Design a protein with these regions (language model features):
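Membrane-proximal intrinsically disordered regions of secretory-pathway and membrane-system proteins
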Residues: 1-257
Length: 257
C-alpha cells in the first residue's frame, strides 16, 4: 500500500464510496422487495446476489428502522405489553394471569410497578426474539412444499424476505392506512372512535395474503390458484406463529423481571 492509501482524503473517499454502494443496494433491494414479490428470493437462490443486499443484511437494516419508527408511532405489534398478555385474546391468557398474580404477591409490588419493568424488558427482547418467527415460518413452507425437494435454507431465504416486507408494511403501509381511515372519519364528521385494532389486523392480513400469493408463485413456480390457496393457509398459520412468538416473549420477560 502506498502512503496515499493512508491519507485523509483517500479514507473519506473510500467511506463515501462504501456508503453510496450500500445505499444503492438498499434502494434496489427495497424496490424489488415491495414491487416484485418473491423476486429477491428467486435471484438469491440462483446465485445472482451482487446487485442486491443479502437477505439477513436487508432484514437487519429494516428491523432497526422498524423498531425506531415503532417507538415514534407507538406501534406494539411485536413489543406486546403486559396488559395485552393478561387481557388480550391470547391462548395463554389464564396462565399469564396466574403467573403474574403469584409473582406480584411474592414480591409485594403493585401491578403498575411490575408492568413498567415487564414492558421495558419486552421492548429489549422483542428486537431479537422477532427472529424466532423466521425459521418457524420456513418450516411451514417446507411442509407446504415438501414435494418441491428444496433445501431448508431456500425456504429460510424466502421467509426472511417475507418478514422484511411485513416490517416495511408496518413502517409505511399501516400508518398510511390509519391516516386514511381517521381522515375519512374526520371528513364526514364522524366523532365516535372508528379505528380499532381489528382494522389493523384486517388490513395486514389482506396485504399479506396478496403479497404472499404473488411471492409463492414467483419463487416456487406454481399456478396462481395453487399459490393463492397455500397463501390463504399460510396467512392463517401466521396467527399461530405470532402467538408462539408472544408466548416466548412473555416467558422471557417474566423470568427476567
Amino acid at each position: 500500500m502506498s502512503s496515499r492509501d493512508f491519507s485523509i482524503p483517500h479514507f473519506i473517499g473510500q467511506a463515501i464510496d462504501t456508503l453510496t454502494h450500500i445505499d444503492s443496494k438498499f434502494y434496489q433491494s427495497i424496490k424489488y422487495l415491495i414491487f416484485k414479490p418473491g423476486f429477491l428470493s428467486a435471484e438469491f437462490v440462483k446465485g445472482k446476489q451482487i446487485a442486491y443486499m443479502k437477505p439477513v443484511q436487508l432484514f437487519l437494516l429494516i428491523n432497526i428502522i422498524y423498531f425506531f419508527s415503532a417507538s415514534v408511532l407507538d406501534q406494539k405489534t411485536f413489543t406486546t405489553p403486559l396488559y395485552f398478555h393478561l387481557v388480550g385474546a391470547t391462548p395463554y391468557r389464564t396462565l399469564a394471569q396466574s403467573m403474574v398474580s403469584q409473582k406480584i404477591q411474592e414480591r409485594g409490588v403493585s401491578i403498575e410497578e411490575y408492568e413498567a419493568h415487564f414492558d421495558k424488558n419486552g421492548t429489549a427482547f422483542s428486537k431479537t426474539l422477532i427472529f424466532i418467527m423466521i425459521p418457524v415460518f420456513a418450516l411451514l413452507l417446507q411442509l407446504f412444499y415438501i414435494r418441491a425437494k428444496r433445501f431448508y435454507v431456500e425456504h429460510l431465504v424466502f421467509s426472511i424476505h417475507f418478514f422484511a416486507f411485513l416490517l416495511v408494511l408496518l413502517i409505511i403501509g399501516l400508518p398510511l392506512f390509519k391516516f386514511a381511515i381517521m381522515g375519512t372519519a374526520a371528513l364526514f364528521h364522524y366523532r365516535e372512535a372508528i379505528y380499532t385494532e381489528y382494522w389493523s389486523i384486517g388490513f395486514i392480513s389482506i396485504c399479506l395474503f396478496f403479497y404472499l400469493s404473488l411471492s409463492l408463485k414467483t419463487f416456487y413456480q406454481q399456478s396462481v390458484i395453487l399459490s393463492a390457496g397455500k397463501s390463504l393457509l399460510l396467512t392463517y398459520s401466521l396467527i399461530w406463529v405470532l402467538w408462539f412468538y408472544r408466548l416466548i416473549l412473555f416467558f422471557s420477560c417474566f423470568y427476567t423481571t
